[in-house]
């Protein structure tokens, strides 16, 4: 009865289990198909489908090839062990116990065989599929044309072939070890190995089988010793990377001896098939183990201790020389040579004033500190936003005097920020169909402020009107802050920015970016991919609708070129009238002989990357070769990805171009409008900066002493992270004109004193040209951290900081720039002040300068320079000519104002109303400062001064708007006497809101309510 009652349960179980398995299998297949097909559609949309198919086919090939081989090897040994089982087994307690297992297993032997081989095959296949990069490099490897100095093999062997051989060795060792494991288990289970039987414990058949597998292991070990010899070029035993004296004279001979011992062991294992017992193979294995300890370990240690250590500098000298040469070549710093720089501290005011290549261009706006300022002044609507860290780029603009001027700009794009939507606005239609894009390219000269604020009137706001930037399409559908996906071309109109009053301008996407989802099939697939049923069910989606995904520029390029390591900082630029994201792509390798290894994530980390949400930190991958081989662009409107070869001589790039043909365009295809905005990449510079700290030394003896090693200074902000490099437009010693440089100071590894100054040009004519200024040994010039301490310990600075903070405001130190100036080195640091409350934002309130042991602090750069060098030193900073290449010096050496502009803070003749407004602003500011200086501060008087200042600023904006004739300059140039922006002491004292004319910034020109906006300029 009990048996009968269980039958329905067993029957249901037999039916239910297969059904569940079929359901799970179906779901898995659908999920895989959905992912693959939607990925294919994405790759087709960016014209990189060949990348998708090449990677997919390669992974499938490796999965099948190595999975099947593993399954065959393991399965063959299981079958062989089963077939070699003895027909009769001696009676024993052990065998009686095993018989119970055999009776259960044997009926299902085929299923067990399939299960075991499938499991091992899947594991091996999945592991091998992840090695698609190793496979493609091995198959397509191009020659470096340079042999290594130890074995005289082309470096391509180490970069492309050696890694695959190591992978293949590991695979075969795993296969043989797994085979040995299942063989021993099978022989034991079926009586081929008997542990508790007197007499013969291993049958001859089992012995032969096991001996063959052990012989194969010995052969593979011999191959491992062979490869180990070539691996010595990556040894870290010596002073530098690569084969050292001990490696060459002890380890390499030891590896050769061990190789032959392994071959002898393999022969003994095979010979043991015909012998009784295990004496010979065990003896051989013992000799191999003992030899590996004595010859492979103890002997090299003795050589190192008694031959090398007493005379290490002499013994290691030729190998250190190899390391220096290889490292400099592998990291592209072989042509960087230090040049002596006296770094004089005896400089006159006249010399400083005469330096019109650097002083007028000194950057006062810190892109890592002013995101909130851009947000408050240029956001316009809550659903727009700016990334935490802005960018720096240079533009050549033509002034009213028809002269072209190149200068730095702090730039960003006004991106869509859906976090700014209200609670009632958060629904699927708004988030994915209506609020789809950002709008506007925002820029401000980095050396200019407008009463403490970025000078947008002389940045992007004026350019849509005069066409200087030539912006034709300013909508941003692909950006760093874009949502995961948006659907465009629907029946819903897209919000396109503010219109008159509280109205909104609308538009419909007209581009060809993204994937068409007009068909029900595609909508269903994307609904599955994003887990959103509305994609399938929404009636707003039409046959013309497109879905935009993978919208972060870095993610798009990573998809198009998965073989590239991308720089952590994409930056926007105007290229051919369109907002374009520019990214730098690196080809890397860890297979360059004798080259020092670095961990990318460590050497590229600094105080900005560790705190910024839009700067991607590099992965912790070790490399010993890197090239900036690719420049990539992403169109912000249609998402088009374009790859350009930048270093066409790079063999790693040529290898990848062979693996993925027609995906990288030649360097000659780079348009001039793009080339003008290409810059030397930060992450590469940081890697090279770290290495130059040691490898600027070419003499092996000096390198060994480490006496002249340099380090990257800690950031002066107290974060404990390295100081980031800075892009500056400056004139380097020995150069005729200023250039756009990426710069960094270096300090002595043994002290905090400044040791060197490193810069590399980004100008097209001198791109990649390094300048390395080496300061005299024993100099007393402070490093950045010491200078920061000296500035804040200065009495005048401390007093002013205390005054600002007493009103409840926060002081923010900007980037501490180090600049060669008049034969010395000048430090410049802007100071920003931010009021309390949600409306507060940083405004420039002062500038600190340091030269030698002298500190200057003032409301402007010119004032700070005058305090350090004497009266007249800040004349160049006070001039209106930004970019010394276009300014004409007056008789007193001060650059003459540009046509249509007076000097900074000085209105052009005839502009009486403007002069009055500037004067009123100055008086209101001073009144506010006087009110704050009282003890306690007079906030009533301060509020009144704020109102008067707001009124004066309003008149300034009105007079300098396009409707005013003639236009007048309202900006305070670097070093001007117009006061910096006052800071509200309480939330009630808010800064004046941007005037309506400011909405032109970035092309947000107001339009009629509900109008469909055509692509607007700017």
Curated annotation (Swiss-Prot):
InterPro entries: UPF0182. PANTHER family: UPF0182 PROTEIN SLL1060. It is a multi-pass membrane protein. Residues 886-920, 960-1018 are annotated as: Disordered. It is found in: Cell membrane. The lineage of its organism: Bacteria, Bacillati, Actinomycetota, Actinomycetes, Frankiales. Residues 886-896, 960-980 have a biased composition (Low complexity). It comes from the Bacteria. Residues 981-995 have a biased composition (Pro residues). The chain crosses the membrane at residues 13-33, 60-80, 109-129, 167-187, 208-228, 250-270, 283-303. Keywords: Cell membrane, Membrane, Transmembrane, Transmembrane helix. Belongs to the UPF0182 family. This is UPF0182 protein Francci3_3781. Its main location: membrane. GO terms for cellular component: extracellular region; plasma membrane.
């Amino acid at each position: 009865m009990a048996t009968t009652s269980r039958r329905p349960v067993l029957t249901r179980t037999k039916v239910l289990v297969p059904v569940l398995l079929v359901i799970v299998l179906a779901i898995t297949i659908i999920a895989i198909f959905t992912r693959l097909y939607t990925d294919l559609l994405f790759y087709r949309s960016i014209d990189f489908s060949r990348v998708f198919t090449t990677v997919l086919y390669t992974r499938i090939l490796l999965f099948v090839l190595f999975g099947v081989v593993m399954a065959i090897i393991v399965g063959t040994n299981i079958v062989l062990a089963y077939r070699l089982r003895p027909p009769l087994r001696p009676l024993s307690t052990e065998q009686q116990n095993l018989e119970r297992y055999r009776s259960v297993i044997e009926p299902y032997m085929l299923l067990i065989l399939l299960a075991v081989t499938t499991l091992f095959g899947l594991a091996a296949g999945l592991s091998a599929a992840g090695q698609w990069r190793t496979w493609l490099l091995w198959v397509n490897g191009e020659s470096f044309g340079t042999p290594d100095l130890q074995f005289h093999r082309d470096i391509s062997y180490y970069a492309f072939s050696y890694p695959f051989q190591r992978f293949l060795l590991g695979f075969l060792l795993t296969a043989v070890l797994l085979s040995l494991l299942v063989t021993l288990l099978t022989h034991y289970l079926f009586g081929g190995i008997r542990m508790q039987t007197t007499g013969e414990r291993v049958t001859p058949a089992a012995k032969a089988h096991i001996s063959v597998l052990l012989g194969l292991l010995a052969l593979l070990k011999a191959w491992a010793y062979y490869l180990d010899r070539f691996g010595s070029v990556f040894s870290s035993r010596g002073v530098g990377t690569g084969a050292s004296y001990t490696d060459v004279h002890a380890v390499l001979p030891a590896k050769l001896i061990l190789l032959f011992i392994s071959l002898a062991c393999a022969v003994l294992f095979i010979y043991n098939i015909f012998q009784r017992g295990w004496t010979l193979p065990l003896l051989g294995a013992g000799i191999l183990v003992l030899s590996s300890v004595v010859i492979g370990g103890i002997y090299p240690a003795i050589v190192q201790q008694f031959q090398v250590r007493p005379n290490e500098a002499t013994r290691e000298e030729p190998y250190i020389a190899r390391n220096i040469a290889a490292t400099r070549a592998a990291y592209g710093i072989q042509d960087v040579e230090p040049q002596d720089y006296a770094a004089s501290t005896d400089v006159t005011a006249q010399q400083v004033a005469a330096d019109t290549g650097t002083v007028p261009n000194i950057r006062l706006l810190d892109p890592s500190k002013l995101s909130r300022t851009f947000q408050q002044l240029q956001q316009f609507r809550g659903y727009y936003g700016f990334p935490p860290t802005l960018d720096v780029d240079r533009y050549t603009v033509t002034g009213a005097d028809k002269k072209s001027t190149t200068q730095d700009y702090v730039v960003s794009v006004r991106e869509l920020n859906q976090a700014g939507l209200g609670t009632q606005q958060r629904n699927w239609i708004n988030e994915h169909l209506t609020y789809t894009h950002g709008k506007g390219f925002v820029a401000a000269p980095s050396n200019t402020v407008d009463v403490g604020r970025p000078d947008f009137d002389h940045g992007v706001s004026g350019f849509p009107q005069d066409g200087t930037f030539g912006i034709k399409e300013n909508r941003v559908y692909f950006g760093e802050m874009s949502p995961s996906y948006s659907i465009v071309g629907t029946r819903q109109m897209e919000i396109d920015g503010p219109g008159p009053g509280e109205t909104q301008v609308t538009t419909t996407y007209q581009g060809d970016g993204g994937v068409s989802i007009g068909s029900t099939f595609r909508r269903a697939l994307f609904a599955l991919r994003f887990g959103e049923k509305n994609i399938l069910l929404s009636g707003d989606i039409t046959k013309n609708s497109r879905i935009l995904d993978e919208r972060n520029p870095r993610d798009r390029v990573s998809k198009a070129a998965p073989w590239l390591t991308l720089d952590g900082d994409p930056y926007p630029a105007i290229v051919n009238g369109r907002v374009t994201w520019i990214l730098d792509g690196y080809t890397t390798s860890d297979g360059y002989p004798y080259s020092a290894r670095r961990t990318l994530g460590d050497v590229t980390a600094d105080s900005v990357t560790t705190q910024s949400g839009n700067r991607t930190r590099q992965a912790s991958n070790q490399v010993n070769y890197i090239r900036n081989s690719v420049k990539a662009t992403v169109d912000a409107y249609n998402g088009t990805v374009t790859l350009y070869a930048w270093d066409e001589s790079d063999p790693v790039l040529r290898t990848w171009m062979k693996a993925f043909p027609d995906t990288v365009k030649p360097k000659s295809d780079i348009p001039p409008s793009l080339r003008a905005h290409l810059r030397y990449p930060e992450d590469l510079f940081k890697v090279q900066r770290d290495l130059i700290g040691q490898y600027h030394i070419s003499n092996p003896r000096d390198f060994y002493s480490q006496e002249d090693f340099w380090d990257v200074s800690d950031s002066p902000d107290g974060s404990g992270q390295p100081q980031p490099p800075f892009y500056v437009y400056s004139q380097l010693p020995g150069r005729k004109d200023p250039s756009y440089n990426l710069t960094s100071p270096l300090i002595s590894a043994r002290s905090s004193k400044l040791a060197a100054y490193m810069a590399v040009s980004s100008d097209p004519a001198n791109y990649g040209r390094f300048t390395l200024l080496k300061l005299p040994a024993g100099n007393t010039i402070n490093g950045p951290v010491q200078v920061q301490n000296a500035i804040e310990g200065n009495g005048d600075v401390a007093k002013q900081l205390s005054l600002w903070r007493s009103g409840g405001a926060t002081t923010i130190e900007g980037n501490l720039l180090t600049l060669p100036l008049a034969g010395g080195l000048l430090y410049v640091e802007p100071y920003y002040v931010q009021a309390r409350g949600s409306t507060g934002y940083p405004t420039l309130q002062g500038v600190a300068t340091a030269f030698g042991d002298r500190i200057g602090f003032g409301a402007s750069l010119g004032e700070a320079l005058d305090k350090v060098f004497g009266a007249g030193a800040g004349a160049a900073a006070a001039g209106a000519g930004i970019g010394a290449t276009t300014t004409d010096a007056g008789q007193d050496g001060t650059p003459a104002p540009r046509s249509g502009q007076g000097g900074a803070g000085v209105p052009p003749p005839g502009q009486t109303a403007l002069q009055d407004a500037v004067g009123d602003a100055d008086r209101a500011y001073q009144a506010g400062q006087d009110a704050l200086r009282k003890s306690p501060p007079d906030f009533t008087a301060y509020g009144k001064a704020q109102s008067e200042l707001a009124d004066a600023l309003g008149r300034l904006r009105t007079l300098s708007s396009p409707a005013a004739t003639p236009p007048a300059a309202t900006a305070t140039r670097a070093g001007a006497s117009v006061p910096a922006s006052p800071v509200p002491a309480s939330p009630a004292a808010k800064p004046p809101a941007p005037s309506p004319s400011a909405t032109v910034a970035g092309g947000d020109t107001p339009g009629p309510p509900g109008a469909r906006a055509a692509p607007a300029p700017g």
